[in-house]
């Protein structure tokens, strides 16, 4: 498809530019030596066909923590790799001994191919709405199922995507194994875009399952301030 090809070319050209911009920005130092992971450069080793959870930053990570904990309790022998796009999100995984963290690759064909071919995940579980066409296409070529958890889609966004329904499904919708939505409205909005009903279910927001205590509230406020600093 022509739009898919255009997207690949554009992201291949822009990825090095975005990488350099992040590297030399004020927040670049927060990534440390691991900033090269944004280009898919993770260590060469056996990752044991892990289940891969992606949470873009603080909010998604906080919502995913109970799910990841329950997954580990149910399958303690299964290796878990988690990715975030920001250092503040990464910090929330720092004390979880049963997960391995990496920064998610930029959505360029080369970066996602390098990353996924080294990782060899058995499945990818994405929190909320972090959907990248090159990554989804690469995982489809490797027969890796992708699940969207805590999925949300506003009526406004659904109406906008509906104008390119065929393109949306070619680049994104067809690549998803299952979408577990927050609300009935979210489910209906995804269905309007052509997602088959058998791929859709409702769980409610995982963020309501967070075990909130004063320490976590304080931590959340701290990371919220850090996140604002990153954007400046």
Predicted ranges, named:
Residues 208-210, 217-219, 223-226:
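Inter-lobe coupling/hinge segments of SF2-like helicase ATPases
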Residues 2-5, 9, 31, 182, ...:
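Alpha-helical structural motif
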Residues 19-22, 26-40, 44-215:
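Active-site and donor-binding regions of nucleotide-sugar-utilizing enzymes
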């Amino acid at each position: 498809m022509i739009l898919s090809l255009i997207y690949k070319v554009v992201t291949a050209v822009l990825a090095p530019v975005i990488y350099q911009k992040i590297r030399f920005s004020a927040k670049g130092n927060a990534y440390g030596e691991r900033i090269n992971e944004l280009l898919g450069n993770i260590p060469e080793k056996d990752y044991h066909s892990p289940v891969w959870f992606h949470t873009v930053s603080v909010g998604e990570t906080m919502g995913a923590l109970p799910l990841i904990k329950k997954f580990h309790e149910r399958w303690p022998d299964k290796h878990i790799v988690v990715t975030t796009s920001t250092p503040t999100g990464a910090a929330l995984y720092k004390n979880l001994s049963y997960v391995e963290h990496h920064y998610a690759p930029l959505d360029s064909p080369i970066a996602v191919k390098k990353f996924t071919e080294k990782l060899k995940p058995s499945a990818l579980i994405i929190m909320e709405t972090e959907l990248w066409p090159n990554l989804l296409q690469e995982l489809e070529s490797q027969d890796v199922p992708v699940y969207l958890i805590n999925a949300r889609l506003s009526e406004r966004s659904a109406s906008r995507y509906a104008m390119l329904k065929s393109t949306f499904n070619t680049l994104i919708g067809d690549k998803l194994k299952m979408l577990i939505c927050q609300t009935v409205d979210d489910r209906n909005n995804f269905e309007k875009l052509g997602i088959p009903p058998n791929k859709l279910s409702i769980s409610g927001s995982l963020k309501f399952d967070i075990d909130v205590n004063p320490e976590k509230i304080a931590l959340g406020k701290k990371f919220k301030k850090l996140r604002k600093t990153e954007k400046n």
